[in-house]
């Protein structure tokens, strides 16, 4: 009966017969909840470490990807530049070929003219020699 009157007053005895303000069942549940919370906090801490490691890994991979992307862009630009240089060089060579063809044609005309002059001079010399 004394226990009931103490219980009504909000006082309880635990398993060691110590006087407590909380009901022993509530105290036990509070202790269990406290341990579950501690386990939960530990798991959250571990989860944050794992996630932090994954974030670092993803950041590292993103940097490597960005570097490779920049290398690929540089290589593509270099290839475009080389193609443009080759095209310009090809145009220069075509222009040089056209110039050399024109020069060859002038030389051919000059050669034909000189051959004609030589033939005329040889004919003149032959006529001159025949007259003597």
Curated annotation (Swiss-Prot):
Compartments in which it is found: Golgi apparatus, cis-Golgi network; Cytoplasm, Cytoskeleton, Microtubule organizing center, Centrosome, Centriole; Cell projection, Cilium; Golgi apparatus
Coiled-coil region(s): 87-112
Keywords: Cell projection, Cilium biogenesis/degradation, Coiled coil, Cytoplasm, Cytoskeleton, Differentiation, Golgi apparatus, Spermatogenesis
Stretches that traverse the bilayer: none
Top-level taxon of origin: Eukaryota
GO cellular component: centriole; centrosome; ciliary basal body; ciliary base; cilium; cytoplasm; Golgi apparatus; intraciliary transport particle
Example of a GO biological process term: protein localization to cilium
UniProt xrefs under Pfam families: IFT20 (PF14931)
InterPro entries: FT20
PANTHER family membership: INTRAFLAGELLAR TRANSPORT PROTEIN 20 HOMOLOG (PTHR31978:SF1)
Role of this protein: Involved in ciliary process assembly. May play a role in the trafficking of ciliary membrane proteins from the Golgi complex to the cilium. Regulates the platelet-derived growth factor receptor-alpha (PDGFRA) signaling pathway. Plays an important role in spermatogenesis, particularly spermiogenesis, when germ cells form flagella.
Name of the molecule in the record: Intraflagellar transport protein 20 homolog A
């Amino acid at each position: 009966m004394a226990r009931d009157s103490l219980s009504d007053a909000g006082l309880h005895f635990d398993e060691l017969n110590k006087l407590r303000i909380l009901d022993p069942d509530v105290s036990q549940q509070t202790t269990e909840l406290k341990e579950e919370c501690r386990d939960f906090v530990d798991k959250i801490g571990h989860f944050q470490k794992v996630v932090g490691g994954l974030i670092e890994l993803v950041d590292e991979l993103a940097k490597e990807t960005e570097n490779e992307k920049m290398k690929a862009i540089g290589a593509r630009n270099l290839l475009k530049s080389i193609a443009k240089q080759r095209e310009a060089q090809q145009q220069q060579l075509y222009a040089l070929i056209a110039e050399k063809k024109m020069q060859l044609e002038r030389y051919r005309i000059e050669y034909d003219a000189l051959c004609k002059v030589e033939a005329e001079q040889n004919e003149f010399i032959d006529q001159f020699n025949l007259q003597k």
